[in-house]
UniProtKB/Swiss-Prot annotation:
The modification Phosphoserine is found at S28. The lineage of its organism: Eukaryota, Metazoa, Chordata, Craniata, Vertebrata. PANTHER family: PROLINE-RICH PROTEIN 5-LIKE, TARGET OF RAPAMYCIN COMPLEX 2 SUBUNIT BIT61-RELATED. Keywords: Phosphoprotein, Signal transduction inhibitor, Ubl conjugation. It comes from the Eukaryota. Associates with the mTORC2 complex that regulates cellular processes including survival and organization of the cytoskeleton. Regulates the activity of the mTORC2 complex in a substrate-specific manner preventing for instance the specific phosphorylation of PKCs and thereby controlling cell migration. Plays a role in the stimulation of ZFP36-mediated mRNA decay of several ZFP36-associated mRNAs, such as TNF-alpha and GM-CSF, in response to stress. Required for ZFP36 localization to cytoplasmic stress granule (SG) and P-body (PB) in response to stress. The keyword Kinase does not apply. One of its GO terms (cellular component) is mitochondrion. GO terms for biological process: cellular response to oxidative stress; negative regulation of protein phosphorylation; negative regulation of signal transduction; phosphatidylinositol 3-kinase/protein kinase B signal transduction; positive regulation of intracellular protein transport; positive regulation of mRNA catabolic process; positive regulation of phosphatidylinositol 3-kinase/protein kinase B signal transduction; regulation of fibroblast migration. Residues 312-346, 351-370 are annotated as: Disordered. It comes from Mus musculus (Mouse). The keyword Ubl conjugation applies. This is Proline-rich protein 5-like.
Length: 370
């Protein structure tokens, strides 16, 4: 058997080696051999990205001009933006929308308002804001739904653009003073909504100019300068309680903010985090989102409630030794409310049980005597 296998080995190796073909000159690397195919694929991808972005740009400008989306156009735009996010342009979509598309679209809105003078300008501004807030803004959010902003969402970017490129350029200072008696409610809504949007870097010059406009139509008004000191009804109420009951530790809004170790203006003007886009929904699923817009007011109410309840407790322990319960109101909307109740602590629930038990005993005694 060894004699039969020995002569076959060189023949097999010779056959296997016969299939090898020499590589052409200058094509020894496999990367260089596939370079033309890579270049063709890259050019096709760039053409696809350009066509997708052109369709998005055309749709956005059409929305600013007052037009709408056609049937199934929103789905096609979302798919185009998803392809753009996976391309080299993905990291520049938000910047390009803010600096190019939004600026170009809002220029049409500004020109429409500047054509009118006096009271007519206020009426046109109210109409423009109603259309922008109810039609344009939701459509922009729907078109750029796949985009997940890093610092600002599409909604915040659009509102800041309307503030800087439309409202502050039409110069409404003198017009607002003359038209205060017949000022449309849409203008007041516009000023308050724009005031609620803050830049990540803190209050800018545009925000300070907006505050000057809000002061003319909203009273009372608490500006950035007013936040530096505890003034107004809150301060007078805290001072009155501290004078009557010197032992009570007053927990006010200013001390609560300073204990955190951050400046008060920085805390109050910190922009609210709005989570949008598909990345956030994939992370959270169907969890209900709660707003934090009233976080500071909730802290202030909690501080005042704590101060008042502690003061009532001291009065009860001083002379009469009576058990004073906090006023309990029937919660008709408790099942639908997402805000925590201050009066739902375990100790207060026990006090309510004791009070209800004593009330039942007194009723039984009265029934036995009768």
């Amino acid at each position: 058997m060894t004699r039969g296998l020995a002569p076959l080995l060189p023949i097999e190796f010779h056959k296997m080696g016969s299939f090898r073909r020499p590589r052409p000159r200058f094509m020894s690397s496999p990367v260089l051999s596939e370079l033309p195919r890579f270049q063709a694929a890259r050019q096709a991808l760039q053409l696809s990205s350009n066509s997708a972005w052109n369709s998005v740009q055309t749709a956005v400008i059409n929305v600013f001009k007052g037009g709408g989306l056609q049937s199934n156009e929103l789905y096609a735009l979302n798919e185009s933006i998803r392809r753009l996010l996976k391309s080299e342009l993905g990291s520049f979509i938000t910047d390009y929308f803010q600096n190019q598309l939004l600026a170009k679209g809002l220029s049409f809105v500004e020109e429409k308002i500047k054509l009118c003078e006096g009271d007519n300008r206020i009426e046109v501004l109210a109409e423009v804001w109603d259309h922008f807030f109810t039609e344009t803004l939701p459509t922009l959010q729907a078109i750029f739904y796949p985009v997940q902003g890093q610092e600002l969402t599409i909604r915040q970017i659009s509102l800041l653009g309307f503030r800087d490129l439309v409202l502050l350029k039409v110069k409404l200072g003198d017009v607002l003073l003359l038209a205060q008696s017949k000022l449309p409610s849409s203008v007041i809504q516009m000023l308050l909504i724009l005031q609620s949007v803050h830049e990540p870097t803190g209050p800018s010059e545009g925000y300070l100019q907006l505050e000057e406009l809000v002061k003319q139509v909203v009273s009372p008004f608490l500006s950035i300068s007013g936040d530096r000191s505890c003034s107004g009804p809150t301060y007078s109420l805290a001072r009155r309680h501290s004078r009557v009951r010197p032992k009570v530790t007053v927990l006010n809004y200013a001390s609560l903010m300073t204990t955190v170790g951050r400046p008060l203006n920085e805390m109050v003007l910190t922009p609210l985090t709005e989570q949008e886009g598909e990345a956030y929904l994939e992370k959270c699923g169907s969890v209900r989102r709660h707003t934090v817009a009233n976080a500071h007011s909730d802290i202030q109410l909690l501080a005042m409630a704590t101060m008042m309840h502690s003061g009532l407790g001291e009065e009860a322990g001083g002379e009469d030794k009576h058990l004073l319960l906090p006023p309990s109101f029937p919660p008709p909307h408790r099942q639908c409310s997402s805000e925590p109740s201050i009066l739902d602590s375990p100790d207060e629930l026990e006090l309510e049980d004791v009070a209800s038990g004593s009330q039942e005993d007194s009723e039984l005694n009265c029934a036995s005597l009768s």
